[in-house]
Protein backbone atom coordinates (compact mmCIF):
# COMPACT_ATOMS: atom_id res chain seq x y z
CA UNK A 1 0.00 0.00 0.00
CA UNK A 2 1.32 3.45 -0.86
CA UNK A 3 1.95 5.86 1.99
CA UNK A 4 0.44 9.31 1.48
CA UNK A 5 0.17 12.53 3.47
CA UNK A 6 -3.39 11.55 4.44
CA UNK A 7 -2.36 8.14 5.76
CA UNK A 8 -2.65 7.21 9.42
CA UNK A 9 -0.16 4.66 10.70
CA UNK A 10 -0.72 1.42 12.51
CA UNK A 11 2.15 2.49 14.73
CA UNK A 12 0.28 5.64 15.72
CA UNK A 13 -2.72 3.58 16.83
CA UNK A 14 -0.79 1.11 18.96
CA UNK A 15 -1.33 3.01 22.20
CA UNK A 16 -5.01 3.39 21.42
CA UNK A 17 -5.27 -0.37 20.86
CA UNK A 18 -3.79 -1.15 24.23
CA UNK A 19 -6.23 1.19 25.94
CA UNK A 20 -9.33 0.45 23.91
CA UNK A 21 -9.26 -3.33 23.64
CA UNK A 22 -8.32 -3.31 19.97
CA UNK A 23 -11.57 -1.61 18.92
CA UNK A 24 -9.65 1.05 17.01
CA UNK A 25 -7.83 -1.61 14.99
CA UNK A 26 -11.11 -3.35 14.22
CA UNK A 27 -12.45 -0.07 12.86
CA UNK A 28 -9.27 0.45 10.85
CA UNK A 29 -9.26 -2.99 9.27
CA UNK A 30 -12.96 -2.80 8.52
CA UNK A 31 -12.48 0.51 6.75
CA UNK A 32 -9.92 -0.94 4.35
CA UNK A 33 -11.62 -4.29 3.97
CA UNK A 34 -8.61 -6.53 4.67
CA UNK A 35 -6.07 -7.82 7.11
CA UNK A 36 -3.40 -5.61 8.63
CA UNK A 37 0.23 -6.62 8.31
CA UNK A 38 2.49 -5.56 11.20
CA UNK A 39 3.88 -2.06 10.62
CA UNK A 40 1.87 -1.55 7.42
CA UNK A 41 0.36 1.89 6.78
CA UNK A 42 -3.41 1.97 6.54
CA UNK A 43 -5.81 4.49 5.08
CA UNK A 44 -7.96 4.85 8.18
CA UNK A 45 -11.27 6.71 8.07
CA UNK A 46 -12.38 5.55 11.51
CA UNK A 47 -10.28 5.57 14.64
CA UNK A 48 -11.50 4.93 18.16
CA UNK A 49 -15.08 5.95 17.40
CA UNK A 50 -14.12 9.04 15.36
CA UNK A 51 -15.04 9.29 11.69
CA UNK A 52 -13.10 11.58 9.37
CA UNK A 53 -14.59 12.93 6.17
CA UNK A 54 -11.63 14.22 4.22
CA UNK A 55 -11.97 17.60 2.57
CA UNK A 56 -12.18 18.10 -1.17
CA UNK A 57 -10.83 21.67 -1.33
CA UNK A 58 -7.21 22.77 -1.03
CA UNK A 59 -5.55 26.12 -0.36
CA UNK A 60 -1.78 26.60 -0.50
CA UNK A 61 -1.01 23.11 0.71
CA UNK A 62 -3.88 22.80 3.18
CA UNK A 63 -6.83 20.46 2.84
CA UNK A 64 -9.42 23.05 3.72
CA UNK A 65 -12.59 21.32 4.80
CA UNK A 66 -11.86 18.21 6.84
CA UNK A 67 -14.76 17.18 9.10
CA UNK A 68 -14.27 14.94 12.12
CA UNK A 69 -17.34 13.33 13.68
CA UNK A 70 -16.73 12.70 17.38
CA UNK A 71 -18.17 9.87 19.49
CA UNK A 72 -20.39 12.46 21.21
CA UNK A 73 -21.90 13.52 17.87
CA UNK A 74 -20.10 16.82 17.38
CA UNK A 75 -18.47 17.68 14.06
CA UNK A 76 -15.08 19.36 14.23
CA UNK A 77 -14.22 21.33 11.09
CA UNK A 78 -10.57 22.02 10.39
CA UNK A 79 -7.93 22.63 7.75
CA UNK A 80 -4.81 20.48 7.73
CA UNK A 81 -1.37 20.63 6.16
CA UNK A 82 0.84 17.54 6.24
CA UNK A 83 4.29 18.13 4.71
CA UNK A 84 5.21 16.02 1.69
CA UNK A 85 8.13 14.62 3.68
CA UNK A 86 5.84 12.99 6.26
CA UNK A 87 5.63 9.21 5.97
CA UNK A 88 4.95 8.33 9.60
CA UNK A 89 8.32 6.74 10.22
CA UNK A 90 9.53 9.70 12.31
CA UNK A 91 7.32 11.65 14.75
CA UNK A 92 6.56 15.19 13.57
CA UNK A 93 5.74 18.31 15.56
CA UNK A 94 2.15 19.60 15.62
CA UNK A 95 0.89 23.18 15.51
CA UNK A 96 -2.74 24.13 16.14
CA UNK A 97 -3.55 27.70 15.04
CA UNK A 98 -6.91 29.06 16.20
CA UNK A 99 -8.24 31.98 14.11
CA UNK A 100 -10.26 34.98 15.17
CA UNK A 101 -13.92 35.79 14.65
CA UNK A 102 -13.51 36.14 10.89
CA UNK A 103 -12.37 32.51 10.71
CA UNK A 104 -15.27 30.87 12.55
CA UNK A 105 -17.21 28.19 10.70
CA UNK A 106 -20.29 30.30 10.05
CA UNK A 107 -18.08 32.69 8.07
CA UNK A 108 -17.66 30.03 5.38
CA UNK A 109 -15.43 27.06 4.66
CA UNK A 110 -11.79 28.10 4.59
CA UNK A 111 -12.33 31.51 6.19
CA UNK A 112 -9.86 30.46 8.89
CA UNK A 113 -7.05 30.54 6.34
CA UNK A 114 -7.19 34.31 5.93
CA UNK A 115 -4.60 34.58 8.70
CA UNK A 116 -0.90 34.04 8.10
CA UNK A 117 -0.06 31.95 11.17
CA UNK A 118 -0.66 28.49 9.62
CA UNK A 119 1.25 29.34 6.46
CA UNK A 120 4.48 30.59 8.05
CA UNK A 121 4.80 27.78 10.58
CA UNK A 122 6.84 25.41 8.45
CA UNK A 123 9.41 28.15 7.87
CA UNK A 124 10.36 27.60 11.51
CA UNK A 125 9.86 23.84 11.84
CA UNK A 126 9.84 21.90 8.59
CA UNK A 127 8.85 18.57 10.11
CA UNK A 128 5.53 19.80 11.51
CA UNK A 129 1.88 19.07 10.79
CA UNK A 130 -0.27 22.22 10.93
CA UNK A 131 -3.97 22.28 11.81
CA UNK A 132 -6.32 25.26 11.81
CA UNK A 133 -9.75 24.56 13.33
CA UNK A 134 -12.90 26.37 12.26
CA UNK A 135 -14.66 26.81 15.57
CA UNK A 136 -18.25 27.78 16.35
CA UNK A 137 -17.38 30.58 18.78
CA UNK A 138 -14.64 31.60 21.21
CA UNK A 139 -16.09 30.02 24.36
CA UNK A 140 -15.89 26.84 26.41
CA UNK A 141 -17.35 24.47 23.81
CA UNK A 142 -14.85 25.64 21.22
CA UNK A 143 -12.04 25.26 23.75
CA UNK A 144 -13.17 21.68 24.33
CA UNK A 145 -13.18 21.17 20.56
CA UNK A 146 -9.58 22.39 20.32
CA UNK A 147 -8.51 19.94 23.02
CA UNK A 148 -10.39 17.08 21.36
CA UNK A 149 -8.95 17.86 17.94
CA UNK A 150 -5.44 18.05 19.40
CA UNK A 151 -5.84 14.69 21.11
CA UNK A 152 -7.27 13.10 17.97
CA UNK A 153 -4.37 14.35 15.85
CA UNK A 154 -1.93 12.98 18.42
CA UNK A 155 -3.50 9.56 17.98
CA UNK A 156 -4.11 9.67 14.24
CA UNK A 157 -0.64 10.78 13.15
CA UNK A 158 2.88 10.05 14.29
CA UNK A 159 3.35 13.14 16.50
CA UNK A 160 6.05 14.01 19.01
CA UNK A 161 3.92 14.85 22.05
CA UNK A 162 6.72 17.06 23.39
CA UNK A 163 6.50 19.33 20.32
CA UNK A 164 2.88 20.45 20.21
CA UNK A 165 2.37 24.20 19.76
CA UNK A 166 -0.76 26.33 20.07
CA UNK A 167 -1.73 29.85 19.03
CA UNK A 168 -4.85 31.97 19.06
CA UNK A 169 -5.50 35.32 17.43
CA UNK A 170 -8.22 37.72 18.63
CA UNK A 171 -11.26 35.57 19.52
CA UNK A 172 -9.03 32.55 19.06
CA UNK A 173 -6.84 33.96 21.80
CA UNK A 174 -9.81 33.93 24.16
CA UNK A 175 -10.45 30.32 23.20
CA UNK A 176 -6.91 29.13 23.79
CA UNK A 177 -6.81 30.87 27.16
CA UNK A 178 -9.72 28.61 28.17
CA UNK A 179 -7.84 25.63 26.72
CA UNK A 180 -4.88 26.55 28.92
CA UNK A 181 -7.23 26.69 31.88
CA UNK A 182 -8.21 23.07 31.30
CA UNK A 183 -5.51 21.08 29.46
CA UNK A 184 -2.31 23.16 29.31
CA UNK A 185 -0.09 20.08 29.57
CA UNK A 186 -0.90 19.17 25.95
CA UNK A 187 1.20 22.05 24.63
CA UNK A 188 4.88 22.95 24.65
CA UNK A 189 4.54 26.72 24.02
CA UNK A 190 1.62 29.04 23.32
CA UNK A 191 1.20 32.31 21.42
CA UNK A 192 -1.71 34.60 22.40
CA UNK A 193 -2.16 37.60 20.07
CA UNK A 194 -4.43 40.69 19.95
CA UNK A 195 -6.75 39.24 22.57
CA UNK A 196 -7.73 39.01 26.22
CA UNK A 197 -7.50 36.23 28.79
CA UNK A 198 -10.61 34.26 29.81
CA UNK A 199 -9.07 31.05 31.17
CA UNK A 200 -8.15 29.75 34.60
CA UNK A 201 -4.73 31.06 35.54
CA UNK A 202 -4.09 28.63 38.39
CA UNK A 203 -4.34 25.64 36.05
CA UNK A 204 -1.95 27.27 33.59
CA UNK A 205 0.63 28.14 36.21
CA UNK A 206 0.48 24.68 37.77
CA UNK A 207 1.54 23.27 34.39
CA UNK A 208 4.21 25.95 33.77
CA UNK A 209 3.48 26.18 30.04
CA UNK A 210 5.21 29.21 28.47
CA UNK A 211 2.91 31.88 27.01
CA UNK A 212 3.75 34.87 24.81
CA UNK A 213 1.14 37.66 24.73
CA UNK A 214 1.40 40.23 21.92
CA UNK A 215 -0.91 43.18 21.35
CA UNK A 216 -0.84 46.76 20.14
CA UNK A 217 -0.63 49.46 22.79
CA UNK A 218 -3.77 51.03 21.35
CA UNK A 219 -5.55 47.91 20.13
CA UNK A 220 -8.86 49.24 18.88
CA UNK A 221 -10.92 46.19 19.87
CA UNK A 222 -9.67 44.95 23.24
CA UNK A 223 -7.24 47.67 24.22
CA UNK A 224 -4.00 46.53 25.82
CA UNK A 225 -5.38 46.72 29.36
CA UNK A 226 -6.81 43.18 29.60
CA UNK A 227 -3.57 41.63 28.37
CA UNK A 228 -1.55 43.69 30.85
CA UNK A 229 -3.84 42.63 33.69
CA UNK A 230 -3.64 38.95 32.74
CA UNK A 231 0.13 39.18 32.51
CA UNK A 232 0.38 40.60 36.03
CA UNK A 233 -2.03 37.98 37.37
CA UNK A 234 -0.01 35.17 35.81
CA UNK A 235 3.22 36.57 37.25
CA UNK A 236 1.60 36.89 40.67
CA UNK A 237 0.39 33.28 40.50
CA UNK A 238 3.92 32.12 39.72
CA UNK A 239 5.33 34.19 42.56
CA UNK A 240 2.84 32.50 44.88
CA UNK A 241 4.38 29.22 43.73
CA UNK A 242 7.81 30.60 44.73
CA UNK A 243 9.27 30.63 41.23
CA UNK A 244 12.20 32.95 40.61
CA UNK A 245 11.71 36.14 38.63
CA UNK A 246 14.01 34.75 35.96
CA UNK A 247 11.92 31.62 35.62
CA UNK A 248 8.69 33.61 35.56
CA UNK A 249 10.03 35.74 32.73
CA UNK A 250 10.68 32.56 30.78
CA UNK A 251 7.12 31.37 31.33
CA UNK A 252 5.16 34.51 30.48
CA UNK A 253 6.08 37.30 28.07
CA UNK A 254 4.06 40.45 27.44
CA UNK A 255 4.89 42.28 24.21
CA UNK A 256 2.89 45.51 23.88
CA UNK A 257 3.72 47.13 20.56
CA UNK A 258 3.82 50.95 20.35
CA UNK A 259 2.37 52.88 17.43
CA UNK A 260 5.85 53.17 15.94
CA UNK A 261 5.92 49.38 15.44
CA UNK A 262 2.99 49.68 13.05
CA UNK A 263 4.07 52.86 11.24
CA UNK A 264 7.55 51.45 10.62
CA UNK A 265 5.86 48.55 8.84
CA UNK A 266 3.72 50.59 6.50
CA UNK A 267 0.58 51.28 8.52
CA UNK A 268 -0.76 54.77 9.13
CA UNK A 269 -0.49 56.15 12.64
CA UNK A 270 -4.27 56.05 12.97
CA UNK A 271 -4.67 52.56 11.50
CA UNK A 272 -6.51 50.03 13.61
CA UNK A 273 -3.91 48.15 15.61
CA UNK A 274 -6.16 45.13 16.06
CA UNK A 275 -6.26 44.18 12.39
CA UNK A 276 -2.72 45.39 11.80
CA UNK A 277 -1.41 43.30 14.68
CA UNK A 278 -3.25 40.23 13.47
CA UNK A 279 -1.40 40.55 10.18
CA UNK A 280 2.02 41.71 11.35
CA UNK A 281 2.53 39.41 14.31
CA UNK A 282 2.25 36.32 12.10
CA UNK A 283 5.18 37.67 10.07
CA UNK A 284 7.28 38.89 13.01
CA UNK A 285 10.26 36.56 13.30
CA UNK A 286 10.85 37.45 16.95
CA UNK A 287 7.29 36.52 17.90
CA UNK A 288 6.96 33.40 15.79
CA UNK A 289 10.53 32.39 16.54
CA UNK A 290 9.71 32.45 20.26
CA UNK A 291 6.75 30.12 19.72
CA UNK A 292 8.73 27.55 17.79
CA UNK A 293 11.94 27.73 19.81
Regions found by a protein language model. Name each.
Residues 85-90, 138-170:
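Gly/Ser-rich "nucleophile elbow"/oxyanion-hole loop immediately N-terminal to the catalytic nucleophile
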Residues 214, 220, 239-293:
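C-terminal catalytic histidine-bearing segment of alpha/beta-hydrolase fold enzymes
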Residues 22-92, 174, 178-182, 242-252:
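A domain-start/cap signature at the N-terminus of enzymes
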Residues 110, 223-236:
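Short alpha-helix in the alpha/beta-hydrolase fold that links the catalytic acid
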Residues 94, 98-147:
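Active-site machinery of serine-nucleophile hydrolases
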Residues 8-9:
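N-terminal export leaders
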Residues 205-211:
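Short, proline-enriched alpha-helix->beta-strand connector loops that line the catalytic pocket
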Amino acid sequence: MNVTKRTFLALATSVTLALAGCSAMEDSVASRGGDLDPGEAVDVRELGGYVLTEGSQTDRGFVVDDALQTPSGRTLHFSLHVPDSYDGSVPYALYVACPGWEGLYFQGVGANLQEGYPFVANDYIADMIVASPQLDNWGEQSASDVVELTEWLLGAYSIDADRVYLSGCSGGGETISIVLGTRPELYRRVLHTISRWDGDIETLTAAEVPVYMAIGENDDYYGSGPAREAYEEIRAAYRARRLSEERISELVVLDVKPTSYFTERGFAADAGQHGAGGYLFAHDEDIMGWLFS
